[in-house]
From Swiss-Prot:
It comes from Danio rerio. It is found in: Nucleus; Cytoplasm. RNA-binding protein that may be involved in the regulation of pre-mRNA alternative splicing. CDD domains: RRM1_CELF3_4_5_6, RRM2_CELF3_4_5_6, RRM3_CELF3_4_5_6. SMART domains: RRM. GO terms for biological process: mRNA splice site recognition; positive regulation of mRNA splicing, via spliceosome; regulation of alternative mRNA splicing, via spliceosome. Its main location: nucleus. This is CUGBP Elav-like family member 3. Keywords: Cytoplasm, mRNA processing, Nucleus, Repeat, RNA-binding. InterPro entries: CELF3/4/5/6_RRM1, Nucleotide-bd_a/b_plait_sf, RBD_domain_sf, RRM_dom.
Length: 452
């Protein structure tokens, strides 16, 4: 029978020819085994070189970890065996974060609140440099069951004096989760949640003008199509006029039928746009799932451009005839409203993607970065989550040892533009996760054919 506070262990660096029956003799000496499962690929069934192990008793797991972790190397392996709590166990499953405490509460007050649910090993109110309470604390029980009982009974149950909301009681984050959250906070502070806002703030004003145009169309779908298109054309010309600072507001438009008057929509002042970025030196990047190219999505923040109607209805095309070759940079500036005239052809043809480019896993030159000193447990998905705040990620890959399927603690991330890559390097190089500091650098052209 398994104890309530039994620990699930992750076993790494085991030979791929060893199955459960071969591993049992190694671990049975520390106690009765409740469950031992070799981890295999769910699609291919191939051995991944690691396993999960749960003893009936918590004490047995601690003994096995102390005796084996990085102490013994199994035949055929280059590195010693790894024996440590699985990620699901490492969630601080006995350690709770308590928020929305009154700032006058002491450690003893918090301990008294949580003692009815079990034996407390640690209880600490977090305080600032001046000694003042931050209104939160960590409480660590002896078992997961006790921690669960405290969450069930206390979370959201009351609002303490001096707190702005009800009591928060939840499992504390792991080191990995804290690291990812800190990375995202750094990215947010640098202003790079929108990938180009760090360097190209004026483009966001351009996007805002497009959003307002779409709002106009959505609210005036019952208008005469010609009147709607004409109004939006005027708004686009005003927003894109380099010599103008304030876009002309769109006044009320009298509908062709009915008595209702649509709401007036005024444009926010839009600064003059900087010269377009020359994108012709970079090869086309893969198309995004919504049909936009990745470069188009970058400069429009995901706003879907409306299809153009006809040359006769597009004064922008006539006014800016010298800018056609920048359509990858300002694609939505050449489209009119598509709703009044559905299923019309696009005026400016987009460059077709080549099949081999759709399968491309690297970005253009200057858009690919290497990351060294990653935590051992980081996977592709966590790498992706770490670098998404800096821009559109084409691929994120942690390098894995083929023999052991264990991380080599480095990887690469490919963006679809150099600015995002530079922003990621600026923010993340030297960033500390646990005991490690990340090393983030640009992949040099001469590295193109090297795996690392």
């Amino acid at each position: 029978m398994k104890e309530a506070d039994a620990i699930k262990l992750f076993i790494g660096q085991i030979p791929r020819n060893l199955e459960e029956k071969d591993l049992k003799p190694i671990f049975e000496q520390f106690g009765k085994i409740y469950e031992l499962t070799v981890i295999k690929d769910k699609y291919t069934g191939m051995h991944k070189g690691c396993a999960f192990l749960t003893y009936c008793a918590r004490e047995s797991a601690l003994k096995a970890q102390n005796a084996l972790h990085e102490q013994k190397t199994l035949p055929g392996m280059n590195r010693p065996i790894q024996v440590k709590p699985a990620d699901s166990e490492g969630r601080g499953d006995r350690k709770l974060f308590v928020g929305m405490l009154g700032k006058q509460l002491s450690d003893a007050d918090v301990r008294k609140m949580f003692e009815p649910f079990g034996s407390i090993e640690e209880c600490t109110v977090l305080r600032g440099p001046d000694g003042a309470s931050k209104g939160c604390a960590f409480v660590k029980y002896q078992s997961n069951a006790e921690a669960q009982a405290a969450i069930s009974a206390l979370h959201g149950s009351r609002t303490l004096p001096g707190a702005s909301s009800s009591l928060v009681v939840k499992f504390a984050d792991t080191e990995k989760e804290r690291g990812i959250r800190r990375m995202q906070q750094v990215a947010s502070q640098l202003g790079v949640i929108s990938p180009m806002s760090l360097h190209l703030g004026a483009y966001n004003a351009y996007t805002q003008a497009l959003v307002q145009q779409q709002a106009l169309v959505a609210q005036s779908a019952y208008l005469s199509p010609v009147a709607t298109v004409a109004a939006v054309q005027m708004q686009q010309l005003a927003a894109l006029n380099p010599s103008s600072i304030i876009a002309t507001p769109i006044a009320s438009i009298t509908p062709s039928s009915g008595t209702s008057t649509p709401p007036t929509i005024a444009a926010t002042p839009v600064p003059a746009l900087p010269p377009p970025i020359a994108v012709n030196s970079y090869p086309p990047v893969p198309a995004a799932p919504n049909g936009q190219s990745a470069s188009e999505a970058l400069y429009t923040n995901g706003v879907h451009p409306y299809q153009a109607q006809s040359p006769a209805l597009d004064p922008l095309q006539q006014a800016y005839t010298g800018m056609q070759h920048y359509t990858a940079t300002y694609p939505a500036a050449y489209g009119l409203v598509g709703q009044p005239f559905p299923h019309q052809p696009t005026l400016v043809a987009q460059q077709p993607q080549q099949p081999q480019q759709l399968q491309q896993r690297e970005g253009p030159e200057g858009c690919n970065i290497f990351i060294y000193h990653l935590p051992q447990e980081f996977t592709d998905s966590e790498m992706l989550q770490m670098f998404l705040p800096f821009g559109n990620v084409i691929s994120a890959k942690v390098f894995v040892d083929r023999a052991t399927n264990q991380s080599k603690c480095f990887g690469f991330v490919s963006f679809d533009n150099p600015a995002s890559a530079q922003a990621a390097i600026q923010a993340m190089n030297g960033f500390q996760i646990g005991m490690k500091r990340l090393k983030v650098q640009l992949k040099r052209p001469k590295d193109a054919n090297r795996p690392y």
